[in-house]
């Protein structure tokens, strides 16, 4: 599993989000995403570590079931309406700082990853960084189909971190209607 430092605080301090793809790892596709969240590090870690909270902001996660010995079974909406089951083993758990995992032998998707929580160098908020490495089902074709359908883990991670930030800072995840459905101010004269 890749544990290399991939950016400095300065690289993610000014923008709210940072994205990098193909950054290493044991599998053919990898990605790192980072976001600054204006909440204490321990609070963010505690919320994430309770895996039952994850479907609150992860659109495609239908359920997370805790199994024995640090294992969890995830049911995820996959491409074409077919659910994918991921069985993960926690490989590292540093309270308040980091959670790392890898797929178990009975997982539908070979994957590994970690999420790290670090105090912002400027004393405000927390840098949350997620690393994902995986082998796409059905190889390159499966990767393309998943990306087009917005079901690719790298694409999903960006949105999930955005929604996590919204939920932790405001208490809700914002949604928006299509522009045609939203009322327009100029229609109310």
Describe each region flagged by the PLM.
Residues 30-34, 71, 85, 98, ...:
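Intrinsic-disorder/low-complexity, polar/charged segments enriched in Ser/Thr/Lys/Arg/Asp/Glu/Gln
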Residues 72-79, 99-106:
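Short beta-strand segments that buttress and anchor functional surface loops
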Residues 2-71, 158, 163, 167-174, ...:
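Hydrophobic ligand-binding cavity/cleft-lining segments
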Residues 67, 91-93, 116-120:
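Short beta-strand micro-motifs enriched in acidic
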Residues 93-99:
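Short, surface-exposed linear segments at secondary-structure transitions and domain or protein termini
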Residues 2-17, 23-25, 84, 102-161, ...:
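Beta-strand/loop substructures that line and gate deep hydrophobic ligand-binding cavities in soluble
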């Amino acid at each position: 599993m890749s544990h290399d430092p991939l950016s400095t605080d300065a690289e993610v301090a000014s923008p709210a989000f940072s994205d990098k793809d193909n950054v290493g790892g044991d599998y053919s596709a990898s990605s790192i995403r980072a976001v600054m969240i204006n909440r204490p590090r321990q609070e963010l870690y505690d919320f994430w570590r309770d895996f039952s909270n994850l479907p609150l902001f992860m659109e495609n996660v239908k359920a997370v079931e805790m199994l024995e010995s640090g294992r969890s079974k995830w049911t995820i909406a996959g491409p074409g309406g077919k659910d994918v089951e991921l069985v993960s083993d926690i490989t590292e758990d540093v309270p308040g700082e980091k959670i790392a995992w890898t797929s178990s032998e009975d997982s539908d998707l070979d994957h590994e990853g970690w999420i790290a929580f670090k105090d912002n160098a400027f004393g405000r908020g927390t840098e949350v960084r997620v690393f994902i490495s995986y082998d796409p089902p059905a190889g390159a074709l499966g990767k393309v189909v998943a990306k087009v359908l917005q079901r690719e883990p790298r694409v999903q991670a960006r949105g999930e971190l955005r929604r996590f930030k919204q939920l932790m800072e405001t208490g809700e995840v914002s949604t928006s209607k299509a522009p045609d459905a939203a009322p327009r101010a100029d229609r109310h004269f």
